[in-house]
Amino acid sequence: MEYRLSHRAQNLRRCMMDAFHLRDAKDMIFFNSGQPAADLYPRALLRAVLDELLAEEPQILAYPGSQGDEELREALAERQNRLDGGAGIRAEQIVVTNGGTGGADLLAQLFIDPGDTVLSETPTFPETLDCFAKAGARLAGVSMDADGPLPDELERLAQKCRPRFFYVIPNFQNPTGRCTSPERRRAVAEIARRHGFFIVEDDPYRELNFDAAPPPSYHSLAPDCTISMGSLSKTIAPGIRIGWLVLPEELVERAVMTLKATALCYPALLHRAAARVLEHPQFDAHIDELRRDLKRRCRLLTGLMSAQIPTGWLTWETPRGGMFLWCRLHGGVSAMDFAVRARDRWHVAFFPGVCFTPNYEGEDFSLRLTFARQTDAQMAEGVRRIAAALKSFQQN
């Protein structure tokens, strides 16, 4: 039988990252998992609040509404305002989604028609871009430096493409680990206002700073032209699939109508449990432990690499937070060739930089390592394998 797929289904891109996941490889060491180690999930807190809810609030298992649990939305607004003093977010502006990617998909349904242009930083997180591409968006990337997206390039593309919005990850960015400077944020906001597009601010890593907190958000600087995205995947657990959008109030009703037509309602038990975890006095201690562990892991990885890998072969940007190390190969070594050989011959997996580009072009000599999930022994063995793989390229 011949199946006639919709244009939207045909627009789906095969994610280049899929070739490097290889979860079944028995002795593979993974530097490609962007989630905390399982022992850092707040399991005791989750268990306690779930037991309490099931025992004392059985009505939580009934059909809920579509915007998201009210207690969760209030907890999210309170926490966002505490972390980012100028945000001024209210629970009524928040629409809870199925993880951060669910928020991106909702934005695509609300704003993108086939042929519209969406801008993003490049490199960036590709699975969000897949949501926009599925809706028929044309993708274009704005290059970055250590301070964030380049304003002159954004200005040029804004004039040329008339974008619907500009997608950014301002804090401890995936994949580069960079944090956009306050000056660069103000410049981006000014361009967005002048050209009449809005900024989609994806901020799942804000709380993962190693030392100093990140600068004020785009939302606090330019609430009139910013839609914020958030997620609990990095601070509680990815498996609970809780994300959210902060929308102008006049858009909330339309967003809820769209969600209702897609999934009717949300998993009320998990929403309420997440709210209770966020409100719990121990949650801040959990975040502090997560920060300390990620900082330690980052230092361990960079220390191992410094000891074993010559700077003529590989260099990297040391992040101030998050879970990603952005590296650059030298000597003309292709990141794709290196990643494939390292995976197949040395059984160590990571992503080449091209995976993080809007149209899978460029970043030929870049690669991303993560330091969030391995044991110390796995990290040490993984660096040994990376060094050996690099040496094999130098000898060719």
Predicted regions span which residues?
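Conserved C-terminal alpha-helix-loop-beta "cap" of PLP-dependent enzymes
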Residues: V252, V256, C327-R368, E381
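Conserved core segment of the aminotransferase class I/II
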Residues: I227-K295
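Conserved core of the PLP fold type I
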Residues: Q59-G196, R206-I227, L294, A377, ...
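Hydrophobic residues in well-ordered beta-strands that form the structural core
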Residues: S120, G141, I199-E201, A274, ...
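Conserved glycine-rich beta-strand-loop-beta hairpin in the small C-terminal domain of fold type I
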Residues: R291-T302, L314-R328
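PLP-dependent enzyme catalytic core of the Aspartate aminotransferase-like
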Residues: M1, D344-R345, Y360-N396
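N-terminal small-domain helix-loop-helix segment of the aminotransferase-like
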Residues: R8-G99, L106, E279-H280, A349, ...
